[in-house]
């Protein structure tokens, strides 16, 4: 990472960050520093961390102060001190140890590098599926793995001169004919000459092939092949048709990958490393615990392993010219495996473990997953003015309201309450206001109520998979320690009331509050953004509640007709059930009397009753034949239907209409009626 990366983000206010491959020159530029004496530092050459006698970082080691900066601000390795930021202080580097007089926070972003003795493929681009290297080269992954890990070699096609292997024709026959012939040259002193002229193996062979690629030609050829395959007719052979389909999918991926490299100005050979970046030491610390013992990040041990093997390979290539070629290639394979373990431990099979049989955490383990660098500290970090609690159902709440516990509300809105106390001259300063809040004086809750009326809150349930995973609500104070939520908004959150937790946030800026009110309120998000269907629909407990509310006694009107003394029916009831006691169905003039009787426990929720209805002809539009007709002495008569009866006068005029219903039906009807009237009032006020 660039040493000026943090200041660059602050200066330009960048809103995004892109991660990708970089060139060896860029890695060197990030890590290299030039001392006043002209010495260039930045390369980590030694696998050591601290000197045990002095407890100071080893020079050119993994914690070197010359490379990564001073441990203490303004103090070099010699102990000299300079004032940071004072331009009069000269020099800015210690002439003895070469440590720069700078803030120690530089050790959080100053990088180093390891100069690899042989090219090494980046295991993410080779082993992750789909393999980018295999896609670009259009070769089987197993073949490339065998080449990278020195299991076999390629004859160099780059030279037009007649080579020994080409003259002997060893590469024109089966693999067995040359697989055992090349090692005959490995024990000679001219192995380097032989290797540079005749064969290509290891990650260097991959790098050469990637460097020779022309991405535009790859796109053109892949497109032509894709069109040719599309013009072919189906053979009728399912296996062949699938094979053609897979090839077409591969060509599409290859073209997209080549376009991505062209669009981002990334060279394919950068997927093979020549310089290995070394993380800043503060990101892989060594901590001293009780008893003088040291705890080190696993990354340090993996870096040490890479440096040990790389230094061994360097010695074999430089000091011992008579080293057998098989030993050199074996050491190159060890370097490749060490870098693989550093980047992604276990990607090639059995992961590397320490002496306690614990798996080392590689670079991939540090950044991926829920506890990785991105999700834990960059994306999912804790923020101020937020809380978290279990959600419970709040059936009495409006759709756009949520119940906030007092304990959470007073913490979230504490600064606003303090300002309110001071403005109303109820507290002289912040300390007095906090004291009143701790003592939970009644005036505190009154001011809190006023503050909450003007501040929406945001509720979020992880994982936030779509925009309805976070919605705005108007908070109201509730007792207890759980957040109350209207059950109709649960589908958008994919939440239920079996122990789910939700986070609550307070939008502070004016822009955030406007966005919450205009776009994020729950009553404004009634449709699914994906398919447009209603998302605030009754489910689960609400459906059961509606069923119970609208269920009624199963006896039916035919078994208990409206009659003051139907002895035949009552005798039938008594014969069927000895415990049955006939009760005449009550009659009510309005719904308020019926609900009042239910609250007084004179009737049940599902008890059938007769309710006088307003003269609404819609209930008798069906030309239904009455079940019974009862005549009174005064000439009035009753027409009894399935669920209603009509009282008519002698002139056949309708006097009253009674409907047969239950208290549950009445309650549901009143709720629907109030909702319709509310929408009507809202519509009339808007117009």
UniProtKB/Swiss-Prot annotation:
Cellular location(s): Plastid, Chloroplast
Gene this chain is encoded by: rpoC1
Family: Belongs to the RNA polymerase beta' chain family. RpoC1 subfamily.
Recorded catalytic activity of this chain's protein: RNA(n) + a ribonucleoside 5'-triphosphate = RNA(n+1) + diphosphate
SUPFAM superfamilies linked: beta and beta-prime subunits of DNA dependent RNA-polymerase
GO CC terms: chloroplast; DNA-directed RNA polymerase complex; mitochondrion
UniProt binding sites for Zn(2+): 76, 78, 94, 97
Complex formation: In plastids the minimal PEP RNA polymerase catalytic core is composed of four subunits: alpha, beta, beta', and beta''. When a (nuclear-encoded) sigma factor is associated with the core the holoenzyme is formed, which can initiate transcription.
EC number from the UniProt entry: 2.7.7.6
Cofactor(s) this protein requires: Mg(2+); Zn(2+)
UniProt-listed Gene3D superfamilies: 1.10.40.90, 2.40.40.20, RNA polymerase II, clamp domain (4.10.860.120), RNA polymerase Rpb1, domain 3 (1.10.274.100)
Pfam families noted in UniProt: RNA_pol_Rpb1_1, RNA_pol_Rpb1_2, RNA_pol_Rpb1_3
Name of the featured protein: DNA-directed RNA polymerase subunit beta'
Function (record text): DNA-dependent RNA polymerase catalyzes the transcription of DNA into RNA using the four ribonucleoside triphosphates as substrates.
């Amino acid at each position: 990472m660039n040493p000026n990366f943090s200041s660059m983000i602050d200066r330009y206010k960048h809103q995004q960050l892109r991660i990708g491959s970089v060139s060896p020159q860029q890695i060197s530029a990030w890590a290299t520093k030039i001392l006043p004496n002209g010495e260039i530092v930045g390369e980590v050459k030694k696998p050591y961390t601290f000197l045990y006698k002095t407890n100071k970082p080893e020079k050119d080691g993994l914690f070197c102060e010359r490379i990564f900066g001073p441990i203490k601000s303004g103090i070099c390795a010699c102990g000299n001190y300079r004032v940071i930021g004072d331009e009069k202080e000269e020099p800015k580097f210690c002439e003895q140890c070469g440590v720069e007089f700078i803030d120690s926070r530089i050790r959080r972003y100053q990088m180093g590098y390891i100069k690899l003795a042989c090219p090494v493929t980046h295991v993410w681009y080779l082993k992750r599926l789909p393999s980018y290297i295999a896609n670009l080269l259009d070769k089987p992954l197993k073949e490339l793995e065998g080449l990278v890990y020195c299991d076999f070699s390629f004859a160099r096609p780059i030279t037009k001169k007649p080579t020994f292997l080409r003259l002997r024709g060893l590469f024109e026959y089966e693999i067995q004919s040359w697989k055992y012939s090349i090692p005959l040259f490995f024990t000679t002193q001219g192995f380097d000459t032989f290797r540079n002229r005749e064969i290509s193996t290891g990650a260097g062979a991959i790098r050469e092939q990637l460097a020779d690629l022309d991405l535009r030609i790859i796109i053109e050829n892949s497109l032509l092949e894709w069109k040719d395959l599309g013009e072919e007719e189906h053979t009728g052979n399912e296996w062949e048709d699938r094979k053609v389909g897979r090839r077409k999918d591969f060509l599409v991926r290859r073209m997209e990958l080549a376009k991505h490299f062209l669009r981002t100005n990334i060279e394919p050979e950068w997927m093979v490393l020549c310089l290995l970046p070394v993380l800043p030491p503060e990101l892989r610390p060594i901590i001293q615990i009780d008893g003088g013992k040291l705890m080190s990040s696993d990354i340090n041990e993996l870096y040490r392993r890479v440096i040990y093997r790389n230094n061994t390979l360097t010695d074999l290539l430089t000091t011992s010219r008579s080293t057998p070629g098989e030993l050199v290639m074996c050491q190159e394979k060890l370097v490749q495996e060490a870098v693989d373990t550093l980047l992604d431990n276990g990607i090639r099979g059995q992961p590397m473990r320490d002496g306690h049989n614990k798996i080392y955490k590689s670079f991939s383990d540090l950044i991926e997953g829920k506890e990785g660098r991105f999700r834990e500290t960059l994306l999912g970090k804790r923020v101020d003015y937020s809380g978290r609690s279990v959600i419970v159902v709040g059936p009495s709440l409006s759709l756009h309201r949520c119940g906030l516990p007092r304990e959470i509300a007073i913490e979230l809105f504490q600064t606003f309450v303090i300002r309110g106390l001071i403005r109303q001259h109820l507290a002289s300063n912040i300390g007095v206001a906090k004291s009143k809040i701790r003592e939970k004086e009644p005036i505190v809750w009154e001011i809190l109520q006023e503050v909450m009326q003007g501040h929406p809150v945001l509720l979020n349930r992880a994982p936030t998979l779509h925009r309805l995973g976070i919605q705005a609500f108007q908070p109201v104070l509730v007792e207890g320690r759980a957040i109350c939520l209207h059950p109709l908004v649960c589908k958008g959150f994919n939440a239920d009331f079996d122990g789910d937790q939700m986070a609550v946030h307070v939008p502070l800026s004016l822009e955030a509050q406007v966005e919450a009110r205009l776009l994020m309120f729950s009553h404004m998000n009634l449709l699914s953004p994906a398919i447009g269907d209603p998302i605030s629909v009754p489910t689960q407990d609400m459906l059961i509640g509606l069923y119970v509310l609208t269920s009624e006694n199963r006896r039916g009107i035919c078994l208990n007709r409206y009659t003051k003394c139907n002895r035949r029916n009552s005798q039938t009831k008594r014969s069927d059930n000895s415990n049955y006691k006939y009760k005449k169905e009550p009659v009510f003039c309005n719904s308020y009397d019926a609900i009042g009787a239910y609250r007084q426990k004179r009737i049940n929720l599902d008890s059938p009753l007769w309710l006088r209805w307003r003269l609404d002809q819609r209930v008798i539009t069906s030309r239904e034949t009455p079940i019974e007709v009862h005549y009174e002495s005064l000439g009035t008569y009753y027409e009894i239907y399935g669920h209603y009866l009509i009282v008519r006068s002698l002139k056949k005029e309708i006097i009253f209409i009674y409907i047969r219903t239950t208290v549950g039906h009445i309650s549901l009807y009143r709720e629907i009626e109030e909702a319709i009237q509310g929408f009507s009032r809202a519509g009339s006020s808007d117009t």
